């Protein structure tokens, strides 16, 4: 019985790749140094999978930034602004596309389906001159082979690649991305031919868009593309891998009829209905790669349940055609539980990170083949039983409070325009008020103080003194820049979710449970293992201290319940919305305590609201209903004169704008600087928005400092579709990852731009 892993985390168990990348970007190390760290990581991953008994080990799932960007490089689809002139694409062009450089901005970055991973969106048009410009897939296959490991090279499939792309600026609206298939397929053929020549016997093509709602023409593109590739694929075993959801019946029919394809991979964790399709009919003689081990969470697999699913499938496809797999790439989970030396033993027994999931996949494959590891299986059953019965998981008071929410929709008593009038009387802000999103740069010194305080090497008194000084520095800087609504800079916070989770019951924390978000940026999601409540106030002390340093309004900064949920590893023993309502009640207590503590502007970030949106339209309404309701619960108890802000990230808002309005926030700030036009088009098309809105005026993800003219131009474009009395001027996200040398001039230019336009508007009256 064979085993397979869809993909594996790249960062390394101690984030080795992150530090190597950042050292290279800062000019402190060479390309050779970076390549050595990368090669060592790849080698250890392949050897680890091989040692565990994995038959189908992936290669080319490693990336220095992103696998879609790797595909863009493979196809030579470099936008003209990066000055690429042909030949093998080097790190300079590659990283310029990902991060921008001193003279040109980065390509757009967006969520990878409904995960917290981001990919770099290809910019395509009829003029793109495709060429085979990165031999990475072949090189990595050969690299593994030289180490004695035969791998399955993984490529982003051609149809998914095009459907995940966008039309470049200036391309005619009638342009169809799929019209480029005849141009990219010859390059796929070259790559596949080279892989065959290098000795590959299997190839994996990831076509995750098959789980989306695709109309007939898009499904036909799959049929046509694979018919075109058939002769090149001949002689290879070809796995088409899907993940993240059920595959719709029509797409299943299309997929299982593709020419040249010998194996199909399905997510059977999130895709429970796919099982019914397989049971109703699976093509004879083909392989089924059964994704029964969850690639997106950290809970130990239920061996008994998985084994029973696999045995049922074995009866349909046959023993020699069933392969045990992960539900998706393990990129979306933490790397290795072995590094968690401080985690509570009971909770630890309930978990499995990527390295443990490799063991789980192989244990299930062996059990199916009649070589069951009895000790491992009984330990698994004991851990599951302990989790089900542990008193740490259930809190009756929380269960009752959450149950009492049913039947009410928790809205503020007054409508938004009346509230904004009450708030303006109190805050007295100019038109186009300026603010920032919350965090300010975190210096090495600041991180050291936090780390030492956590390790009890610094007294509480010294810690408070250091944080107070940092807050004072941030407040003084904002006053000097003449920003209207201030923030305290969040120097006490390591992460916008972890900080709250550490103070809520029902959460556990890892030391090294890092997951890649984009590029070198990793997040360490908390683990929600039980009912959630707030034992005491979490942010009031610091926010009140910051407000005492200035006469200007100071924003209290909270992370919203939906974002805490979507950026955590969430318990899988109750529906997600029930956990979300519990978090909402805890945040509601905090909002009301901030108001009592004299904070008149409170921001409740829902950066991740959209990313939790199910992939299929039929499931959107239910999700949006409970997500928006959770947000309203947090602030339904405050006075009209308290201004509630929210912030959202990387969102394609067009499809959820009515839900955003229904959140009923007083002001919404949006991270949109890489997707300007998309956002403004929503308002251009006549959506009436009565609350305050601050579309980000510059991109904080790039080191580039925008000029005041550029920012003013952006604000003017916004004023063409938004009323001047509702527009706010702000960066598109928090400034934590930037340096002060970048932040000061950028914010100065932002304030100058706002003042310039204010004076233009005043003189135009």
From Swiss-Prot:
Catalytic-site annotation from UniProt: 701
Binding site for L-homocysteine: 437-439, 605
Cofactor(s) required for function per UniProt: Zn(2+)
Record-listed E.C. numbers: 2.1.1.14
Binding positions (Zn(2+) 2): 658, 662
Subcellular location: Cytoplasm, Cytosol
Catalyzed reaction equations: 5-methyltetrahydropteroyltri-L-glutamate + L-homocysteine = tetrahydropteroyltri-L-glutamate + L-methionine
Keywords attached to this entry: Amino-acid biosynthesis, Cytoplasm, Metal-binding, Methionine biosynthesis, Methyltransferase, Transferase, Zinc
Cofactor note: Binds 2 Zn(2+) ions per subunit.
Ribosomal protein listed as a keyword: no
GO molecular function, one term: methionine synthase activity
Presence of the UniProt keyword Cytoplasm in the record: yes
Binding site for Zn(2+) 1: 647, 649, 671, 733
Sites where the protein binds L-methionine: 437-439, 490, 605
Tissue-specific expression: Expressed in leaves, stems, flowers, siliques and seeds.
GO biological process: 'de novo' L-methionine biosynthetic process; DNA methylation-dependent constitutive heterochromatin formation; methionine biosynthetic process; methylation; response to zinc ion
Domain of life: Eukaryota
GO cellular component terms given for this protein: apoplast; chloroplast; chloroplast stroma; cytosol; peroxisome; plant-type vacuole; plasma membrane; plasmodesma
Record: residues binding 5-methyltetrahydropteroyltri-L-glutamate: 18, 116, 521-522, 567
Family from the record: Belongs to the vitamin-B12 independent methionine synthase family.
Cited PANTHER family: 5-METHYLTETRAHYDROPTEROYLTRIGLUTAMATE--HOMOCYSTEINE METHYLTRANSFERASE (PTHR30519)
Record-linked NCBIfam families: met_syn_B12ind (TIGR01371), PRK05222.1 (NF003556)
Role noted for this protein: Catalyzes the transfer of a methyl group from 5-methyltetrahydrofolate to homocysteine resulting in methionine formation.
Entry protein name: 5-methyltetrahydropteroyltriglutamate--homocysteine methyltransferase 1
Species annotation: Arabidopsis thaliana (Mouse-ear cress)
């Amino acid at each position: 019985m064979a085993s397979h892993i869809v993909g594996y985390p790249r960062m390394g168990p101690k984030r080795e790749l992150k530090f190597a990348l950042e050292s290279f970007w800062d000019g402190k190390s060479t390309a050779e140094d970076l390549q050595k760290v990368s090669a060592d990581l790849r080698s250890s991953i392949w050897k680890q999978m091989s040692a565990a008994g994995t038959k189908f080990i992936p290669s080319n799932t490693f990336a220095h930034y992103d696998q879609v960007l790797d595909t863009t490089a493979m196809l030579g689809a470099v936008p003209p602004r990066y000055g690429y002139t042909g030949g093998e694409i080097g790190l300079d062009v590659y990283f310029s596309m990902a991060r921008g450089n001193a003279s040109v901005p980065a390509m757009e970055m967006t969520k990878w389906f409904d995960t917290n991973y981001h990919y770099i969106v290809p910019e395509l048009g009829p003029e793109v001159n495709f060429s085979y410009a990165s031999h990475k897939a072949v090189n990595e296959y050969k690299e593994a082979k030289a180490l004695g490991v035969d791998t399955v090279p993984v490529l982003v499939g051609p149809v998914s690649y095009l459907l995940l792309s966008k039309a470049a600026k200036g391309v005619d609206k009638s342009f169809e991305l799929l019209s480029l298939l005849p141009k990219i397929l010859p390059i796929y053929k070259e790559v596949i031919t080279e892989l065959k020549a290098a000795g590959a016997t299997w190839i994996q093509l990831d076509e995750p868009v098959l789980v989306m709602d695709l109309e007939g023409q898009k499904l036909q593109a799959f049929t046509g593309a694979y018919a075109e590739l058939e002769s090149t694929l001949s002689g290879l075993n070809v796995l088409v891998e899907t993940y993240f959801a059920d595959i719709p019946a029509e797409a299943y029919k299309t997929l299982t009829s593709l020419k040249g394809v010998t194996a199909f991979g399905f997510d059977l964790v999130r895709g429970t209905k796919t099982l019914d399709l397989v049971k109703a009919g699976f093509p004879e003689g083909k392989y089924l790669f059964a994704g029964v081990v969850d690639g997106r969470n950290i809970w130990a697999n239920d061996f008994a349940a998985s084994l029973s699913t696999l045995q049922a499938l074995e009866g349909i496809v046959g023993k020699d055609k069933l392969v045990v797999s992960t539900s998706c790439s393990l990129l979306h989970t933490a790397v290795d539980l072995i590094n968690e030396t401080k985690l509570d033993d009971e909770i630890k027994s309930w978990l499995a990170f990527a390295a443990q999931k490799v063991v789980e996949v192989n244990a299930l494959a062996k059990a199916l083949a009649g070589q069951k590891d009895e000790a491992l299986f009984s330990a698994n059953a004991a851990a599951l039983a302990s989790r089900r019965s542990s008193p740490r998981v259930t809190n009756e008071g929380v269960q009752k409070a959450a149950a009492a929410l049913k039947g009410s929709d928790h809205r503020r008593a007054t409508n938004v325009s009346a509230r904004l009038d009450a708030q303006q009387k109190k805050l007295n802000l100019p038109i186009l008020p300026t603010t920032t999103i919350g965090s300010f740069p975190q210096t090495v010194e600041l991180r050291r103080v936090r780390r030492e305080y956590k390790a009890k090497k610094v007294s509480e008194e010294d810690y408070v003194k250091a944080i107070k000084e940092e807050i004072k520095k941030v407040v003084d800087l904002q006053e000097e820049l003449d920003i209207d609504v201030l923030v305290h800079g969040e120097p006490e916070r390591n992460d916008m979710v972890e900080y709250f989770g550490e103070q809520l019951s029902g959460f556990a924390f890892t030391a090294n449970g890092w997951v890649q978000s984009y590029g070198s940026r990793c997040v360490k999601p908390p683990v929600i293992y039980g009912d959630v409540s707030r034992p005491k106030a979490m942010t009031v002390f610091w926010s009140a201290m910051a407000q005492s340093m200035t006469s200007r309004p100071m924003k209290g900064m909270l992370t919203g319940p939906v974002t805490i949920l979507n950026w955590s590893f969430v318990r899988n023993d109750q529906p997600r919305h029930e956990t979300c309502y519990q978090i909402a009640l805890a945040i509601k207590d905090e909002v009301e305590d901030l108001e009592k503590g004299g904070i008149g502007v409170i921001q409740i970030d829902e950066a991740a609201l959209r990313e939790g949106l199910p992939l299929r339209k039929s499931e959107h309404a239910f999700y949006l209903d409970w997500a928006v309701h959770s947000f309203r619960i947090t602030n339904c108890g405050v006075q009209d004169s308290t201004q509630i802000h929210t912030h959202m990230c990387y969102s394609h808002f067009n499809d959820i704008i009515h839900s955003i309005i229904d959140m009923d926030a007083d002001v919404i700030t949006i991270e949109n600087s890489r997707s300007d036009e998309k956002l403004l088009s929503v308002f251009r098309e006549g959506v009436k928005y009565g609350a305050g809105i601050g579309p980000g005026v510059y991109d904080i993800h790039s080191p580039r400092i925008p000029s005041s003219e550029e920012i003013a131009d952006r604000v003017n474009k916004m004023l063409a579709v938004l009323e001047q009395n509702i527009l706010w001027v702000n960066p598109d996200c928090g400034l934590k990852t930037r340096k002060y040398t970048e932040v000061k001039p950028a914010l100065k230019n932002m304030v100058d731009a706002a003042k310039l336009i204010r004076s233009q508007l005043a003189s135009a009256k």
